[in-house]
């Protein structure tokens, strides 16, 4: 997509360091399936032989109800970076997350700590951490967000 076609996905005039909940989706570059092992590579293994939900990382919401496929090393890097967000940003918590084949979903919550990093900085750091470990730029430019404004949005 050329610069002239690029759409900015943030709400204009909204302060993304405002306390609250945010639903974030970050896609891989070219929407390539970097995060789950290939179905073809696992056809010789019975489903019961695979680790539970393939996660290997104690991360709330990291499950694949339809496939139970293990994460690739890039998927593990993403899951670990998600898990570590509260270590780097004490005012942020990950309520739920899931690593999909070519994207991740996060339900991030920011508490009321003045002067702390907002969603853009947190997502930028997480993306940079995964790309550095992978050795290449794994993510597409930007990300999608939805500001959770009430209980209806949260469910």
Language-model segments: residues:
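Short catalytic/metal-binding and nucleic-acid-binding patches
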Residues: 1-155
């Amino acid at each position: 997509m050329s610069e002239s076609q690029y759409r900015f996905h943030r709400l204009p005039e909204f302060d993304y360091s405002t306390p609250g909940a945010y639903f974030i989706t970050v896609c891989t570059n070219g929407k390539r399936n970097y995060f789950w092992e290939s179905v073809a590579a696992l056809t010789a293994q019975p489903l019961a032989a695979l680790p539970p939900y393939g996660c290997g990382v104690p991360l709330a919401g990291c499950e694949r109800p339809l496939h139970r496929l293990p994460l690739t090393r890039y998927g593990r890097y993403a899951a670990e970076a998600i898990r570590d967000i509260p270590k780097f940003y004490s005012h942020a918590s990950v309520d739920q997350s899931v690593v999909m084949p070519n994207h991740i979903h996060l339900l991030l919550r920011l508490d009321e700590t003045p002067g702390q990093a907002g969603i853009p900085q947190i997502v930028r750091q997480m993306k940079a951490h995964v790309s550095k470990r992978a050795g290449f730029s794994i993510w597409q430019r930007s990300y999608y967000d939805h500001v959770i404004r009430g209980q209806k949005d949260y469910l």
